[in-house]
Amino acid sequence: MTASTLKTLSAQLAAKEVSAVELARHYLARIEARADLNAFIHVDPEATLAQAQAADARLAAGDAGPLAGIPIAHKDVFVTRGWRATAGSKMLDSYVSPFDATVVERLAAAGMVTLGKTNMDEFAMGSSNENSHFGPVKNPWDVARVPGGSSGGSAAAVAADLAPAATGTDTGGSIRQPASFSGITGIKPTYGRVSRYGMIAFASSLDQGGPMARTAEDCALLLSAMAGFDARDSTSLEPGRGGDAEDFGRLLGRPLEGADAARPLAGLRIGLPQEYFGAGLADDVRTAVRAALAELETLGATLVDISLPKTELSIPTYYVIAPAEASSNLSRFDGVRYGHRAAAYRDLADMYRKTRAEGFGWEVKRRILVGTYVLSHGYYDAYYLQAQKIRRIIAQDFQNAFGQCDVIMGPVAPTVAWKLGEKTDDPLQMYLADIFTLSTSLAGLPGMSVPAGFGANGLPVGLQIIGNYFEEARMLQIAHAFQQATDWHTRRPAA
């Protein structure tokens, strides 16, 4: 079962070579054996095995799809009925959700079995998974290093074979960057493709859920179950406008139109932003990404130099808009209705102050303060409105680029995973780690990370694929063709 893809597990379950209960027990044992990674915040073996038994009953009755009986881990930003939902924060340490997030609900309806809730940066604010109230997650490739964030627990769980797949969320790179650092595949779909209902909010105009797994084929299978219109989410794309049910794996294994099996990507124009290959890119990452691009040329693709001139403005733009939205979203955590409440206080105002001072970590407090500042009278026009204008310009830069190419590719991050504690005292250096992923999120475009080799100290490097709106199926087709020609996605860290 170790390092099995979802396709393999599905076939084994259908052939009765293994049961859902046996699979669940196997992965629960793996989670216990690798507790040192701190990838999970909460597991409930009794609940997991009950779900597995129900999946076995569906399989026996012939009432099951391709995901039935397969275990999955959920990032602890998705509320799950009867399970804790902490968002990695002391503020929600004891919160147990009375309902399922739409993502959880849809995957459960497909028959998937919840293994547990994965660790994450508090309220998804971070790039290293060191900001969790429950302690840092460790990278399975080197436990002295970060796995990336904020979906670091999900990435580490899949990389270390603690789960065959996991859910994640991406606000500024939080699926793609940990997927790159941990050597797995992950995709952030077009904004609005996947419902945010039941996903604890960070920045509502940026947050987007997506799958993390071993292969593009696995991600396509998961995204097909996760995506689609949801009336409970006001930002969900409507049917006819990107919200229709879709088989995201329908193009896998097929050459592009006009191409053939020998050169399946013939005719594909890959845009390479000059801003993604500048002086800030580490040599080892550059070498791995260039080698991956050379492989894509062998498959028939053509490389085209392009420019995304406002890339350098993505960090200041993001760190105005995202904190502004966070300061509003997190105002609900006040100790009154649910979550942490200070034990001793003089009056209501004192209770608010002490509850939030005790319940939030330093990075969350920093972003709340920044967000409150940029929304305050006298600064709203100077900062927030200007950031929104630049956001529209960044989105237009991408549309201009897509006039010259079909997809855009480059590194996911400037470096491989850094050591635990290396950047915690320098927030700016931490923020710079997201320079290649933020602009995609600001534009609402789909982006993914695909394993593309190794850099310094044998650490994984991811290749970023950015598509135009609603082109996830083509991105997955390209990623699958690359993975059929390479074996980077099959490499695993030592047990």
Curated annotation (Swiss-Prot):
Assigned EC number: 6.3.5.7
One Pfam family here: Amidase
Catalytic center residues: 75 (charge relay system), 150 (charge relay system), 174 (acyl-ester intermediate)
Gene Ontology BP terms: translation
Coiled coil location: none
Catalytic activity annotation: L-glutamyl-tRNA(Gln) + L-glutamine + ATP + H2O = L-glutaminyl-tRNA(Gln) + L-glutamate + ADP + phosphate + H(+)
Record's subunit section: Heterotrimer of A, B and C subunits.
Family that this chain belongs to: Belongs to the amidase family. GatA subfamily.
Role: Allows the formation of correctly charged Gln-tRNA(Gln) through the transamidation of misacylated Glu-tRNA(Gln) in organisms which lack glutaminyl-tRNA synthetase. The reaction takes place in the presence of glutamine and ATP through an activated gamma-phospho-Glu-tRNA(Gln).
UniProt-recorded name of the protein: Glutamyl-tRNA(Gln) amidotransferase subunit A
Organism: Ralstonia nicotianae (strain ATCC BAA-1114 / GMI1000)
